């Protein structure tokens, strides 16, 4: 069972990740925001690609639910931390971070 401390530790372990205020939440960004932690620290919103969101929500509906708004249609997904193992949380955050990570600069020849 994961908690907010696990979430924060894992999210900040990715290269280039930082924690920033975001309205009433805490945002975790690399190049762009890939996750936010709720004020009560019981849930988090994680940014998947829409094609990644559907199977996540179907396989683990107790852990993942698409946000019921335009952000949800873009892949933002609510994760209930207590319903996730630490390994599941890490896999979800890594998936989101990969989309937000700084792009490698092209090498000059």
Q: Where does each model-flagged region fall?
A:
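Charge-dense, helix-prone N-terminal extensions
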Residues: 1-109
